[in-house]
């Protein structure tokens, strides 16, 4: 079993979630990428055992935004349903 989510999957989510962060919050690309890569949401996405990619980019963005607002990604409706 792999110890991290595939690079292709992470690259896809990096691009999609960072685009949403830039659009909604007005960050530049580098800043948005750094914010996402340093988030607990990203660490959860990179953990293959959590299978976070199943939520899609919209779900991952929602989880990240919940983390930004409340301090915990676990406050997202996506994770409360699990």
Where on the chain are the PLM-derived regions?
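C-terminal alpha-helical interaction appendages
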Residues: 1-82
């Amino acid at each position: 079993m792999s110890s991290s989510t595939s690079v292709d999957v992470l690259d896809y989510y990096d691009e999609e979630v960072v685009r949403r962060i830039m659009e909604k919050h007005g960050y530049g690309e580098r800043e948005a990428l750094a914010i996402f890569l340093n988030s607990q949401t990203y660490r959860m996405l990179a953990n293959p055992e959590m299978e976070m990619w199943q939520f899609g980019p919209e779900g991952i963005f929602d989880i990240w935004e919940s983390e930004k607002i409340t301090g915990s990604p676990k406050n997202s409706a996506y994770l409360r349903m699990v």
